[in-house]
Amino acid sequence: MGISRTLSKLIMRSPIDFHGAVCQLGNQNIRFNSKQLMQDAEEVYFSIKSKTNFKRGVVASELYFNALGFNQVESIDISSNDKPSFIEDLGEDISNTKLINNFDLVFDGGTLEHIFNPDKALNNIKKMLKLNGHIIHQVPCNNQLEHGFFQFSPSYLNKFYEENNFLVKEILLICVGPPKLDDFMRVNVYVYDKEEVFRMHSKGINLPSTFLLMHFVAQKIAEDKLVIPKVDIQAEFSKMENQSKNIGYEKTNFLKSFFKSTFPNIWRKMGILKAVISRYSSTLYDRVTGHNLKKLGKF
């Protein structure tokens, strides 16, 4: 659990209200100092709410969130190692009434993947938030084998929150570099586009990244009972995969077009090679040109 300079900049530019009470899922390790925070805030046009002076480390998390504008900073963890405000197992129903409907922001900086019952944890987050409160998840998407129990697809969080009366405000994909180096280097951040990600998957296209993180922001807009979404994700994938094969097929099938127009007589005699070129030229084009996700920038 930790907040790098990249992740901090994404927090500061998040579409949330920076006031009131925040609860961290695990006491966050702040991987920069207050001087660097001031520099990063200026870069993303964020107004620091209070002067602060802190060094790197877990002890800085309260001062960090104070500087963002929160006057009450709490944390919850399963053990006392990092001195959390509350000791609770988020994989079970939380029992402390001080946690219910008490927070304007719940921040998950890499805890959800370590909880064996993530659906239970998400329900606890829902209960902890005040009406109109926000959740921010910064969790692994890809290439973090054995970092925790899970890596999350955006569809998982998106589906849960949409069906439980939350407004999903932002989903970003963060191309994180090698461990420990991401504190010193800027990384590419992309806006999540479900249809484009399905197309990339069907074409074997990946984002160039050692690790892939997700930055997810949603707002609680109504109170309701827990809903566990039921969806045939495989059927949805197959449908979108077929759509991706048809979108711009003639445009991307450049080898076929080239041969037909340049060597029409040879093309008519090519037999089975015509089918091979028609089948794979579009895929080759996609592999060369890569993805079409919107790049938010380097952070």
Roles of regions detected by a PLM:
Residues 175-227:
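A conserved mid-domain beta-alpha-beta active-site/ligand-binding segment of alpha/beta enzyme cores
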Residues 239-299:
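Membrane-proximal basic amphipathic "stem/tether" segments
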